[in-house]
């Protein structure tokens, strides 16, 4: 079966999953959907098929992309009488959530030791809602050569997939990515507050600095949020606590002794404790200002 002939489904149609589903549907002409509620009838009008349960999704799809928040939600969708495993069909499972590398490997081992005929590729994404909408996500693949190649062909409409190594490699790469993102966002937030309190127009400041070494995709995509103090959630700030925890796990497993990571974990835990966990990550500006 070619990747074009494979029937593809996606579970998890939140801020990232919904635009990814749009790109997959546009590229393939058909797509099977599953989520907590049937809120995406416009996709059905364009050719998508709604599955009322994970079991129904896996009964129709050869490949399922999971955009659920993390592994506990995915395992709940796999197990039980209405879970994907109950469909009893071979399945390529693409784990696109940010998860623990160890956890992804353990899930694959559990599935391999059972009667389930499920192959797993981890494929976390980076680029945020803007990247998901534009179809420019960075997609980090971990898995066997054959499975990762199939995953890359299927996910290509959503961005740039790159195979980085065996199962779990994608999640290690995403942990590294989140370490950079978390540090950069907090640095931008602190710089914004100290500049504003010094009487500098932060809109003009970031327009200027975006063209220098301080410029980044993160700054460009959050420029207006920082200036307008609009923290309506794109990606929830509380997820950074989870993600940095995965980075700490990788550091421990590789005998790496980071100096910045512990401080970042403390700062984002404090941000969540201050009540900002359900805001966008750019709420770091408000958090810094209120400390």
Model feature map: region roles:
Residues 1-66, 129, 157, 162:
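NAD(P)+-binding Rossmann beta1-loop-alpha1 motif at the extreme N-terminus of oxidoreductases
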Residues 31, 50, 119-121, 162, ...:
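Hydrophobic beta-strand scaffold residues
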Residues 54-118:
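Rossmann-fold NAD(P) dinucleotide-binding segment
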Residues 20-24, 107, 194:
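Hydrophobic residues within alpha-helices
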Residues 8, 77, 98-179:
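Rossmann-fold dinucleotide-binding core
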Residues 169-291:
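Helical "substrate-binding/catalytic lid" subdomain
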């Amino acid at each position: 079966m070619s990747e074009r002939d494979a029937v593809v489904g996606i579970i998890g149609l939140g801020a990232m999953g919904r635009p990814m589903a749009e790109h997959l549907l546009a590229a393939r002409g058909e797509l099977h959907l599953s989520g907590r509620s049937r809120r995406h009838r416009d996709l059905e009008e364009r050719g998508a098929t709604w599955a009322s349960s994970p079991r129904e999704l896996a009964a129709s799809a050869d490949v399922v992309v999971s955009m659920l928040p993390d592994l506990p939600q995915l395992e709940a969708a796999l197990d039980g009488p209405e879970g994907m495993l109950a469909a009893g069909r071979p399945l390529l499972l693409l784990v696109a959530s940010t998860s623990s590398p160890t956890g992804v490997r353990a899930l694959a081992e559990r599935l391999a030791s059972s009667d389930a005929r499920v192959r797993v590729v981890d494929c976390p994404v980076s680029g945020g809602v803007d990247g998901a909408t534009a179809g420019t996500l960075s997609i980090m693949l971990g898995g066997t050569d054959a499975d990762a190649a199939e995953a890359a062909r299927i996910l290509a409409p959503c961005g740039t997939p790159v195979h980085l190594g065996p199962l779990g490699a994608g999640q290690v790469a995403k942990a590294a990515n989140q370490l950079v993102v978390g540090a950069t966002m907090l640095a931008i937030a602190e710089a914004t507050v100290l500049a504003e309190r010094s009487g500098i127009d932060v809109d003009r400041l970031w327009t200027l600095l975006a063209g220098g070494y301080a410029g980044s995709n993160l700054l460009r995509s959050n420029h207006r949020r920082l200036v307008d103090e609009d923290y309506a959630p794109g990606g929830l700030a509380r997820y950074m606590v989870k993600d940095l925890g995965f980075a700490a796990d990788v550091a421990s497993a590789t005998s790496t002794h980071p100096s910045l990571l512990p401080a970042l974990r403390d700062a984002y835990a404090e941000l969540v404790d201050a009540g900002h966990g359900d805001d966008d990550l750019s709420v770091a500006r408000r958090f810094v200002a209120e400390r």
